[in-house]
Curated annotation (Swiss-Prot):
Pfam families the UniProt entry points to: C1ORF64
Compositional bias annotation for Basic and acidic residues: 1-16
Membrane-crossing segments per the record: none
Start-end of Polar residues biased regions: 17-26
Top-rank taxon, per record: Eukaryota
Protein name (database record): Steroid receptor-associated and regulated protein
Subunit architecture: Interacts with 14-3-3 proteins.
Annotated spans, Disordered: 1-30, 96-149
Cellular component, GO, one term: cytoplasm
Chain's role: May regulate the transcriptional function of androgen and estrogen receptors.
Example GO BP: positive regulation of intracellular estrogen receptor signaling pathway
Length: 163
C-alpha cells in the first residue's frame, strides 16, 4: 500500500507518529481536577463533620496523565440534630480556618467578599419577634448561628475552584 504525497495526509501521519512516540499534547485550557475535597458543616452544632476514611484502595496513577488540575473544594452546609453515619465531629477552630484561608485563590466574585449580610435571617432579627420571649435553648442556637456565620465569612471565597 503506497502513501499519498498529499501534504495534508503527510502532516496528519506525522502528528500521529509524534503522539504515539510519547510526546504529550499541549494542555487543554480547562483540565479536570484530580480530586474533589468536600467539607461538611453541621448548622445545628456549628462544627465541621469529617467523612470517614474510604475503604476503597487508592487508584493506581497512570504514567501519562497529561495536564492535572488542583483539587476542587466544596463546602456543604446541612441542618439537623443527628450526624451522618460514619462521621466524626471536629470543631471549627480559628486555626483551621486560617489554614484553609491560606490555600484559597484570590477572590474573583462580582461583589466584595465582605458583602454578606450583617446578620442571617432568623427569628432574632424579625421585628415581629422582638417583643416575644425567647424559648429555652434560644441563646445556644443563637451562639451556634453566630459561629457558623463567622465561619462562613472567613470561607467566603471557597465557592469556586482552587486554581
Amino acid at each position: 500500500m503506497a502513501f499519498s504525497k498529499d501534504p495534508r495526509r503527510t502532516s496528519l501521519r506525522d502528528s500521529s507518529v509524534e503522539m504515539s512516540s510519547g510526546t504529550q499534547p499541549s494542555c487543554a485550557p480547562k483540565a479536570m481536577p484530580t480530586a474533589h475535597v468536600t467539607f461538611l458543616i453541621d448548622c445545628a452544632t456549628g462544627k465541621q463533620v469529617s467523612l470517614a476514611a474510604s475503604t476503597a484502595p487508592p487508584h493506581a496513577s497512570r504514567a501519562n496523565q497529561g495536564c492535572v488540575a488542583p483539587p476542587m473544594k466544596t463546602f456543604v452546609m446541612f441542618r439537623g440534630k443527628t450526624t451522618m453515619l460514619g462521621t466524626q465531629n471536629i470543631s471549627l477552630s480559628r486555626g483551621a480556618l486560617d489554614g484553609a484561608k491560606d490555600t484559597l485563590p484570590p477572590y474573583r466574585g462580582l461583589g466584595a467578599p465582605h458583602s454578606l449580610p450583617a446578620s442571617l435571617p432568623g427569628p432574632q432579627n424579625d421585628p415581629k419577634a422582638q417583643g416575644s420571649s425567647l424559648k429555652p435553648g434560644a441563646t445556644e442556637k443563637h451562639s451556634t448561628r453566630e459561629k457558623v456565620k463567622h465561619s462562613l465569612k472567613a470561607l467566603t471565597c471557597l465557592c469556586g475552584q482552587v486554581e
